[in-house]
Amino acid sequence: MPLSSMAMRKVGDRYEHVGQADFSRLRYMMICGCGFPNSQHNFEPAVAQFKQCFPRNHTIITIPESPMFNAPEAAVVTEPRLALVKQAGSQYAQSGEIDGELLHEIASPMIPEDQYAAIVNGGM
């Protein structure tokens, strides 16, 4: 069953379909990882699409170097990062928000970008 009807209304400078029910209490979260060494110029399309689909009540977490979570030898850097993600989850569960500094820290590289690229390229 569709969540919205064919009817439209203008909200700000855009049009959106009228919902079949009141979904204003819902919150939306995107957690997106990638295999690149940083968040710049890698997540923008996914973030833009998510914001178009869910223009209000959204939280976005981006995690570069995410394949490292599958490498046991990277635990020295991935376990502390996973602890930050769990902390963010606790904040979100309690208040519906995540501290901006915490989001920034989660989105930062776990190791230097050049080192990550060298590992991926088989240079280490």
Description of each model-found segment:
Residues M1-R56:
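Helix-loop-strand module that forms the ligand-binding subsite of alpha/beta enzymes
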Residues Q40, F54-M124:
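Glycine-rich phosphate/pyrophosphate-binding loop and the adjoining helix
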